[in-house]
């Protein structure tokens, strides 16, 4: 209600100002009409032949000039008044008051839920991606391991049944067999490389395709560092030890003129033992030998022959 009263007063004030602006503009336009009439009278008199004397015409021209200046000044002042009135109507700030908040009756609150339509929740989208991923993982399952595990679980059931004839024994055996099948299933679903060489422990497909799909578990390398005196100034002269070694590469060391040589055990084919030899930075007459991995010389002659045949097949392909 307070806002409506203030709005009416504001509108009435604006109406009075607009009426004054209209009056000032009308009087200014009237002054311009008078000025135009005086200008046209001057041109009309100049076109007609003069019958009076020159002095009378000079006085009439002076009177006309003064009247014309007066009319022009009056028109300018009236239009200035119009401009000032327009500027005055644009200044100022509107004031508003907040009306009291209307209290909503509880009857309307009770009737509102009846009018709103009931919206049923949308059904969840079908999980097609999970089914596809499960089917893709099922393709790589090794069923031989599952069959062996299920037979072992059946044997465990029989043993538990004979040992404990109570009612809780079958339930315990079932839970144990279920846990073993789940663990074996999770192990079998892991991604393995079928082309892994069991003798060497290396992936055979990596040499042909350049990519290996074996599990990327980081192996903890066991290192053993010793210092031995150098035999000569040549890096190829390495002090001998209990095993025979074959050099397969070298790498330069930053800040040292002597490179680091890399060797692998050649006593038995496929031995994972490695070592690298480098000059000591504090004493050039000493060598630092770092051993990595353990020696594995327990392979039989048949295993060595099989590994050699596998390597020949890979090299020929």
From Swiss-Prot:
<feature type="region of interest" description="Disordered">
    <location>
        <begin position="145"/>
        <end position="186"/>
    </location>
</feature>
<dbReference type="Pfam" id="PF10533">
    <property type="entry name" value="Plant_zn_clust"/>
</dbReference>
<dbReference type="GO" id="GO:0005634">
    <property type="term" value="C:nucleus"/>
</dbReference>
<protein>
    <recommendedName>
        <fullName>Probable WRKY transcription factor 15</fullName>
    </recommendedName>
</protein>
<keyword id="KW-0804">Transcription</keyword>
<dbReference type="GO" id="GO:0003700">
    <property type="term" value="F:DNA-binding transcription factor activity"/>
</dbReference>
<keyword id="KW-0805">Transcription regulation</keyword>
<keyword id="KW-0539">Nucleus</keyword>
<dbReference type="InterPro" id="IPR018872">
    <property type="entry name" value="Zn-cluster-dom"/>
</dbReference>
<dbReference type="GO" id="GO:0000976">
    <property type="term" value="F:transcription cis-regulatory region binding"/>
</dbReference>
<dbReference type="InterPro" id="IPR036576">
    <property type="entry name" value="WRKY_dom_sf"/>
</dbReference>
<feature type="DNA-binding region" description="WRKY">
    <location>
        <begin position="234"/>
        <end position="300"/>
    </location>
</feature>
<dbReference type="InterPro" id="IPR044810">
    <property type="entry name" value="WRKY_plant"/>
</dbReference>
<dbReference type="InterPro" id="IPR003657">
    <property type="entry name" value="WRKY_dom"/>
</dbReference>
<comment type="similarity">
    <text>Belongs to the WRKY group II-d family.</text>
</comment>
<dbReference type="GO" id="GO:0005516">
    <property type="term" value="F:calmodulin binding"/>
</dbReference>
<dbReference type="Pfam" id="PF03106">
    <property type="entry name" value="WRKY"/>
</dbReference>
<comment type="function">
    <text>Transcription factor. Interacts specifically with the W box (5'-(T)TGAC[CT]-3'), a frequently occurring elicitor-responsive cis-acting element.</text>
</comment>
<feature type="compositionally biased region" description="Low complexity">
    <location>
        <begin position="173"/>
        <end position="186"/>
    </location>
</feature>
<keyword id="KW-0238">DNA-binding</keyword>
């Amino acid at each position: 209600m307070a806002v409506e009263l203030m709005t009416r007063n504001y509108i009435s004030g604006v109406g009075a100002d607009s009426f004054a602006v209209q009056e000032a503009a009308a009087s200014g336009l009237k002054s311009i009409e008078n000025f135009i009439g005086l200008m046209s009278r001057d041109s009309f008199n100049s076109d007609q032949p003069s019958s009076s004397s020159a002095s009378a015409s000079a006085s009439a021209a002076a009177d006309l000039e003064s009247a014309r200046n007066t009319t022009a000044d009056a028109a300018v002042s009236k239009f200035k008044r119009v401009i000032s009135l327009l500027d005055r109507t644009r200044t100022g700030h509107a004031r508003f008051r907040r009306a009291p908040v209307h209290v909503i009756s509880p009857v309307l609150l009770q009737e509102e839920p009846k009018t709103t339509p009931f919206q049923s929740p949308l059904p969840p989208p079908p999980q097609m991606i999970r089914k596809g991923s499960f089917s893709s993982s099922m393709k790589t399952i090794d069923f031989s391991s599952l069959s062996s595990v299920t037979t072992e679980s059946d044997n465990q059931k029989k043993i538990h049944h004979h040992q404990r004839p109570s009612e809780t024994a079958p339930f315990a055996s079932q839970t144990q067999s279920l846990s073993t099948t789940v663990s074996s299933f999770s192990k079998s679903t892991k991604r393995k490389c079928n082309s892994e060489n069991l003798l060497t422990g290396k992936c055979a497909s990596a040499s042909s395709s350049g990519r290996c799909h074996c599990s990327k578990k980081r192996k903890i390398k066991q290192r053993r560092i010793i210092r031995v005196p150098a035999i000569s100034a040549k890096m190829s002269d390495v002090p001998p030890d209990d095993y025979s070694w074959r050099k397969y590469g070298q790498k330069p060391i930053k800040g040292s003129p002597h490179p680091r040589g890399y060797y692998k055990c050649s006593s038995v084919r496929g031995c994972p033992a490695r070592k690298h030899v480098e000059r000591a930075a504090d004493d050039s007459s000493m060598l630092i030998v770092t051993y990595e991995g353990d020696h594995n010389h327990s392979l039989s002659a048949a295993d060595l022959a099989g590994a050699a045949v596998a390597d020949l097949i890979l090299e020929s392909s």
